[in-house]
């Protein structure tokens, strides 16, 4: 069995990253893909469930996992911890499952260092005006919060060149097709094809 591929995907809030991943998972596809579920110490929100949206644990449990080096990456955001379990990621990859990891550029740097075979994708909006419009249409934040999100978005977008692939989310269906193309291309690269067809290649080259 060939090993799965870890895909890191990052984007500013409001770019449509979650919708894009959900859209991809709903389509019939050649490869088995799952989204990584992070651990967090924040309170569970209405509509969320343990093991589906996050693994909700206490700060004490999270700190123990840090000491045990159980996380590929973790961060503290607004007094709550968020982290990606090394064991769960490695288990899925060894089972031949591709994993999508939705994290910011700082977490992406940690993952690249620890898992250099991972591939990273950055998602950009078609314009600042469109990004602002999408944030407004969500109806979740005040004007002050939206302004702060826009400032943070510019900071995040400055790191796009650190990624392997870049997708502009202007047309939703085209963006999904671009994402599918990236996954297919990675599976067809020499490294993965050689591992997948090692027996066949050995037989073909036997004199």
Curated annotation (Swiss-Prot):
GO MF, one annotated term: guanylate kinase activity
Gene3D superfamilies assigned: Guanylate Kinase phosphate binding domain, P-loop containing nucleotide triphosphate hydrolases
InterPro entries for the chain: GK/Ca_channel_bsu, Guanylate_kin-like_dom, Guanylate_kinase, Guanylate_kinase_CS, P-loop_NTPase
Spans through the membrane: none
Catalyzed reactions: GMP + ATP = GDP + ADP
Ligand binding (ATP): 11-18
Coiled coil: none
PROSITE patterns for the chain: GUANYLATE_KINASE_1, GUANYLATE_KINASE_2
UniProt keyword terms in alphabetical order: ATP-binding, Cytoplasm, Kinase, Nucleotide-binding, Transferase
Enzyme Commission number(s) from the entry: 2.7.4.8
GO cellular component labels: cytosol
Guanylate kinase-like domain span: 4-184
UniProt superkingdom: Bacteria
Residues of the signal peptide: none
One protein family per Pfam: Guanylate_kin
Protein location: Cytoplasm
Enzyme class per UniProt: transferase
Cited SUPFAM superfamilies: P-loop containing nucleoside triphosphate hydrolases (SSF52540)
NCBIfam families recorded: guanyl_kin (TIGR03263)
Homology family: Belongs to the guanylate kinase family.
Summary of the function given for this chain in its UniProt record: Essential for recycling GMP and indirectly, cGMP.
Name listed for the protein in its UniProt record: Guanylate kinase
Organism: Buchnera aphidicola subsp. Schizaphis graminum (strain Sg)
